[in-house]
């Protein structure tokens, strides 16, 4: 299981918010880690229905699975990576963000794990904004986001191709295998443009208010 981490290393409570790649190829050690060490109870899959169906998560006993697509197939295929990131926080995504934060508010059983395909882009956006809501320092948020570059290894055959690739091909390669600070910058910039501030985003697009944000902090942050 690649790109896995428990966000407790950021001053969140242990076994509450996890992130990883898709859970299609879990070995026995992965299963034990999720169920017994981290008390996994809910998986939120951010992939499109197509991705959800073609590479299905391994079903673990006692775990609930919810598919909440952050982006559509058309958005992923047609938009540049920065535009795709920005699109994730547009006003037409209100239902998506409201569902995500309602599940966080309602959670009382154990850990919630967020993932997409590689656990770097869609998962990176969602985790970054959850951490923002919890009041985590922006520098720390970016550090966690960029940590995916260390967690995901590029297959050697692709490294060889990169030596002879065009500039455009190299840019596409980097976008596919790595995250960049500029991508996440696009999210926060679009939030400022559309909602005036990060708090405006939480109120207008996520269905949150001061009381709900306080409850989230009490539920997920260390005392």
Describe each model-derived feature in a short phrase.
Residues 1-113, 126-223:
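Cys-dependent protein tyrosine phosphatase-like superfamily
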